[in-house]
Structure formats: C-alpha cells, structure tokens
C-alpha cells in the first residue's frame, strides 16, 4: 500500500508590503473591510458576517470594529505600516472601522469618502410603508 501524503493547504507567502489601501464598504446591513497593496491586489479582508455576526447585528458599529481589527491584524503580519482609507456607503460602522484600524497600529495618511452619488440616474425604489 502506498503511504498517504498529508497535503496541507496552500500557504500564502509572507510579503513585505509597507504601504496599502483600506477599502471600507459600509452598508446598513454589513461592513466589509478589504486591505490591498497600492496596485490593488488584496492582502487581507474581513467582514462583520465573517467575524461571526449574524442578521441585524452585522450592521452595528461593534461588528464593523471587529471586522476592521481582524483585517488589520493580518495586514500587520504582512508588514503593512501606512494606509490610505477609502470609505464607501452610508452605514453605521464607518467611523468605528477607521478608529479600529488606527488603534491596531496602522498609520493613516489619508481618508477619502468615495460613496457613489447618482447625478439623477436610475429611479429610486418606492418608499417602504411599515
């Protein structure tokens, strides 16, 4: 019988990336934090749902803070020190996620709001009546 070789999962090589860009997409239902290098290749990411929150709790500021801390921890392992922050969306976790990145030890050089605003494009969905 042939000996079975234990196959380990593909290990990402530890890259030394000193500068990067943090994309925070904050909606009313969830917050997604992606950390990329300056050319746009994703180094680490996290979201409120991936951090263990379900349902309505994903939209809370605390869930955004937890997601940002998890993504920042992995980026610091890759050697990241300075970041630019691009925030998109109207959600509750915007400021909390930025604060969590700062507390994690990343130096923020720029904060930019890149929320898409229509110049009167598509018709809005009809108003909810509860």
UniProtKB/Swiss-Prot annotation:
UniProt-listed Gene3D superfamilies: Ribosomal protein S11 (3.30.420.80)
What Gene Ontology terms describe where this protein resides (cellular component)?
ribonucleoprotein complex; ribosome
Q: Which UniProt keywords apply?
A: Ribonucleoprotein, Ribosomal protein, RNA-binding, rRNA-binding
Swiss-Prot/TrEMBL GO biological process terms? translation
Recorded GO molecular functions are: rRNA binding; structural constituent of ribosome
Q: What InterPro entries does the record point to?
A: Ribosomal_uS11, Ribosomal_uS11_bac-type, Ribosomal_uS11_CS, Ribosomal_uS11_sf
Signal peptide, first to last residue: none
Return any one Pfam family short name.
Ribosomal_S11
Checking NCBIfam families in the record gives: PRK05309.1, uS11_bact
Instruction: Cite the record's note on assembly.
Output: Part of the 30S ribosomal subunit. Interacts with proteins S7 and S18. Binds to IF-3.
Family, according to the entry, reads as follows: Belongs to the universal ribosomal protein uS11 family.
Q: What does this protein do?
A: Located on the platform of the 30S subunit, it bridges several disparate RNA helices of the 16S rRNA. Forms part of the Shine-Dalgarno cleft in the 70S ribosome.
Query: What is the recorded name of this protein?
Result: Small ribosomal subunit protein uS11
